[in-house]
Amino acid sequence: LEVSREDLLDSLDAAEVSAEVVEGFPEAIAIHSGGAVTALPGFSEGAFTVQDPAAQLIGYLAAPKAGQHILDLCAAPGGKTTHLAELMGGQGKILAVDLHPHRVGLIKQHAKRLNLSCIKADATDGTDPQLLRVALERVSMGQPDAIILDAPCSGLGTLRRNPELRSKNRADVRELVELQRSLLDAAQT
């Protein structure tokens, strides 16, 4: 919201940071050098954030409009949430829900750094429809226009980077399926 992609590329170039446009993603750039992202010019001021291009697809597929109300379940650390808010031009309301209070804190920090006041974050059990309704009421949001759910998964698609996942067994996967089903059921009510 604060800086165009072209202006950010110019700023990074001036700081001798190698970066380029990511084709097919209107806001994305790939940074090839420069050290810690948090130390790059503009990061602390909220000029940009870091998100994998694949995660950005969620925002484009959801195609949120300014003024809409969105419920984002399992939202931490908040990358998809803030991208949705940016696509909405900061106009509307997003309730970002996560079970763990410390992870909700990450969402709040992320939204604050990016100056996205349309994001409200709540530590709520997303599998409980009654608790979700209470959370929606707390932020004066009725029925959301859209629901985003990035449900916990087995992570087996990341075996190359996370070899410890090889120890997953059928019981672990069944447990995840039940959790995913509970989240979907609660989101629909």
Residue ranges with predicted function:
Residues 1-189:
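S-adenosylmethionine
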